[in-house]
Amino acid sequence: MPVLYEQDKHVSSAILTGQERGVLRCQERTSLLHHWKLTKEQIALVEKAGFGWFRLVGSISLNNSLISALVERWRRETNTFHFPCGEMTITLDEVSLILGLAVDGKPVVGVKEKDEDPSQVCLRLLGKLPKGELSGNRVTAKWLKESFAECPKGATMKEIEYHTRAYLIYIVGSTIFATTDPSKISVDYLILFEDFEKAGEYAWGAAALAFLYRQIGNASQRSQSIIGGCLTLLQCWSYFHLNIDRPKRTTRQFPLALLWKGRQQSRSKNDLFKYRKALDDLDPSNVSWCPFEGDLDIVPQSFKDNLLLGRSRTKLIGPKVVEWHFPDRCMKQFGLCQVIPGEVPPRKNEKNHDEDLLEDMNTADEEWMRRRENIVENGGGNGDESEYMQWFNSITVPKLHRDTSLEADIMNVQAAILQFDEVASTLSLEDLHPEEREAIEEAVMSMSNALRVGDWYEASTTNKRKRREEQQQTDWSE
């Protein structure tokens, strides 16, 4: 079996034939986190639950075009980026340094009280019933923010706990576990925060990485147009490692994501092609393989103690997610020589997702228990990676950029119109002023008329139906 056995499903197979999907819609939602006003008592509970450092990261402006270009290089067969200079990935140690989340501890397995209705879970752990705001086992993020963003003065300890749990499920549902529909957040997460001290025993960073791996993997498929997960982690990882549109660093602080919290430049969707070309031209001199060495002096000792787990070949566990962590494919990120890596186990057929999940969780838990026993050592070699690079170039797709032509430009415009038409079809216009609603309806009509040229209207209708069906399948795997 070839290493990249899903090439026909991968977005690169579409790009290389001139089929552009455009820039991904990035669904991490951090822009409203500043509305939450935490008291000292709440901050103490947040710290106890393991999110004391992470809450400091807050909102970082996302570069959707850069994220889209990176996703085009991701291969879910190996959970690595395939760059011209070799494979790279986001490793456990990097999660802890960038986000300030623990990567050692109990696995974060999605839990649910089987005999307890989601509304009763909310009543018991939030003190309120989300009337009209609950869909299945998911509550609206809007209701959480409006009901719990500010803890009243003189609140009892019980009320403080309610408001803190609401904040915690809001922040995980908007960031590390953000799905392709972050407007709704799973009530199941409340169970994880029922006891704040026990919550602090979980490996939240490992769960965040498992979830991000799954989201990038899904988004790397040619049929997808949306991505969730902690995209702040992905973007900051790129800034540390790759000299591509890297902003100036700000004040040195921990978590290290704060180094990139400065003002970002305005960007265009055309930047996707610029970034794609830059990644095509990437050579080792433009890669910072070990970028954190100069900042370790500001890292708390509790995080330094677990940096070794970055080299653990293990299974990562998150809510309803199991993903392999393969540092042996990215040894240059640890200052070691890269040799031809061993084979990776094939992904399971997601059609049997429900049947396989329990088995996956059980075997993954056993693997995670041995995480310190499976530390990858130097694979050997004398510093000469020519044999590895020869092998790598024979199994991958090294370049994606295509020289643009008038025909390609027209296709890109049509792709943008298609994307607008698909987004517009999901919008609710009921709450808008009549003049605003009329203006938007006219714009949508103009776009739809433009698509009637040639076969694009039929393509739009077919694409929307196909993506809805495939997105439903993807949601099962989130």
Swiss-Prot record:
GO terms for cellular component: nucleus. Its main location: nucleus. It comes from the Eukaryota. PANTHER family: PROTEIN MAIN-LIKE 2, PROTEIN MAINTENANCE OF MERISTEMS. Required for the organization of the root apical meristem (RAM) and the shoot apical meristem (SAM). Required to maintain genome stability and cell division activity in meristematic cells. It is found in: Nucleus. This is Protein MAINTENANCE OF MERISTEMS. GO terms for molecular function: transaminase activity. A motif (Nuclear localization signal) lies at residues 464-468. Keywords: Aminotransferase, Developmental protein, Growth regulation, Nucleus, Transferase. Disruption phenotype: Developmental defects, such as short roots, misshaped leaves, reduced fertility and partial fasciation of stems. One of its GO terms (biological process) is meristem maintenance. InterPro entries: AminoTfrase-like_pln_mobile, MAIN-like. It holds the Pfam family PMD. Residues 459-478 are annotated as: Disordered. Expressed in root meristem, root vasculature, shoot apical meristem (SAM), leaf vasculature and ovules.
